[in-house]
Amino acid sequence: MRPLSHLSFFNGLLLGLSALSAATSVVHERREATSSNWVKRARVNPSDKHVVRIGLTQSSLEEAHDLLMDVSNPSSPNYARFYSADEVAAKFAPSTETVNEVQNWLTEKGINASRVAQTQNHGWLVFHATSKEIENLFDTTYYEYHNRKTGKKAIACEQYHVPASVQKHIDYVHPGVNLNPSSGKPSSIRRRAAASKKTKLPARGPRPIQQHDVKGLNVTNCDQLITPECIRALYKIPSARAAPHPNNSLGIFEEGDYYAQEDLDLFFKTFAKDIPQGTHPIPAFIDGAEAPVPVTKAGGESDLDFELAYPIVHPQSITLYQTDDANWASNTTGFLNTFLDALDGSYCTYCAYGECGNDPSLDPVYPDDAGYDGQLMCGVFKPTNVISVSYGEQENDLPANYQQRQCMEFLKLGLQGVSVLFASGDNGVAGPPGDGNSVNGCLNNGTVFSPAFPNSCPYITNVGATKVYPGYTVSQPESAVYDPDGLYSYASGGGFSNIYPIPDYQAEAVATYFKDHNPPYPYYEGAENLGKNGGLYNRLGRGYPDVAANGDNIAVFNGGEFGSSGGTSASTPIFASIINRIIDERLAVGKGPVGFINPVLYKNPSVLNDITNGTNPGCGTDGFSTAPGWDPATGLGTPNYPKMLKLWLDLP
């Protein structure tokens, strides 16, 4: 009987230890649903070996905003004292405590330190282990899954556990709950109903104009067509310095749209004779991208960007960040990750908000059997001081954590002194028609306003659009763009985020708008209450745009023909070019770039031309009205170059 007593005691001890273990471990991730494309097969073989990657929690995420404000706020003693790329990477690398805590846990579970490597960017611990070991490590069961459409295989679990004491140090585990194949193209590209992926702005033109109209164009008829002369007159832009700084090239992003040198030369010959024929951007081609193309294949976006920017910045150079091979550029749901990978090598494997590296179910995967056969390009290009992006999506198009990880990267670029500007969109308070599962591009069955992405990220500068109304001159105030003209219908994008709260640098301006010009619509507070009580917008969300510039009736050569175009994609390279010009003047007097410009502009709105006429309709409403000060149609207003230059020359 005594042996049985000992056995009973031993079993009781095991049960007690098991209960204690369960009490001190927690579910770290759980898959809530599995796509019908994935078929669960047999449990993995216990002796199979796998590469295990544990994404470590990054340091300084909570203080990241304060770090950026410290170098971006004009009142800060550290204004414009930017970090190097290595300093930023080190600042956000996992802490020594995080690495040690996770490594100690692995050792306790039989994964000795000699088996574990830390990646170069310090963000991952990587080791080889058998199925039996990782099931024991994560207190779970792994199964093989087969994708019935693609034939791809993956191993995954439905949930996994980590010790409660270690959980705060772990962001993500692979293999884990995600069913992403290790390589290959997604079986189904998630598309908008009316657009194949990213919105290339504009999507309306160009509208043909008779050739004889070209000869009669001058600053007196800018209400009919906007030429470089009109832009200089509107924003009081003088000629550029004859000897620009060699390290101050303007960056322009393009994807799936390509310029033609013939179009640029035609534009220079007609409107900018001081720019030599053959002038072209510096190539920074990412993951198999190529440019230029024959004039018969020229894209309206790329031609527009360069034809607007060159007359402002020349003889400064322009760098073209042409992104992704032709196959992926026209067949991807994700946005911007491969571009950011190329600027920051650590971003390729960077973990934040439960996202580690690119998402192969959304982003391009390289090598690409149908295109670029090289490896994903990581950290191969240095970011320019200013980057202009005339592309965008809507917040509801991609997962929130995908967007938040990306937004953090824009913050990091700001810490390095990079100014990133985005077009605010061309659909007023809505998304493109068909987006958001509604014909009008709105949320909740076509009623709730649809904020844009990445515009809602508080660490970029959003540019809305204005126009010179018929009969007005360049010396009179512009108005918010609204063209209700059928196929060419267009309104300056603006609204409030469902992901990000109002940033501190913007809080006073937004509060003033609500106090003095309260929109006549019901609202909700917080994305979790989307549409509640008939609310049309999030009263607590980050507002956009931040600024504006002309974006209508823009003169352009495209496909060898002269016409007009427009969109906030025209406004953005204009504003970005002006910032690049200002940086050139700062460099000439021994100062540096200006980095994230929003805090300076919100504290000094008088350097912009306030826009007080117009609205940005959408979702069956008039949208938001312009107003004195900031508004969600034209932001703080359009540039006044002399005032902006003086402001930034006076700053450190």
UniProtKB/Swiss-Prot annotation:
Changing residue 305 to N: 20-fold decrease in catalytic efficiency. It holds the Pfam family Pro-kuma_activ. InterPro entries: Peptidase_S8/S53_dom_sf, S53_propep, Sedolisin_dom, Tripeptidyl-peptidase_I. One of its GO terms (cellular component) is extracellular region. Optimum pH is 4.0. Inactive below pH 3.0 and above pH 6.5. The half-life (t1/2) values for activity loss at 30 degrees Celsius are 150 minutes at pH 6.6, 5.5 minutes at pH 6.8 and 14 minutes at pH 2.4. SUPFAM superfamilies: Protease propeptides/inhibitors, Subtilisin-like. Remains fully active after heating at 50 degrees Celsius and pH 4.0 for 10 minutes. Retains 65% of its activity after heating at 55 degrees Celsius for 10 minutes. The half-life value for loss of activity at 60 degrees Celsius and pH 4.0 is 3.5 minutes. Its cofactor is Ca(2+). Changing residue 301 to D: 1000-fold decrease in catalytic efficiency. Residues 225-651 form the Peptidase S53 domain. It is found in: Secreted, Extracellular space. Residues 23-215 form a propeptide. This is Aorsin.
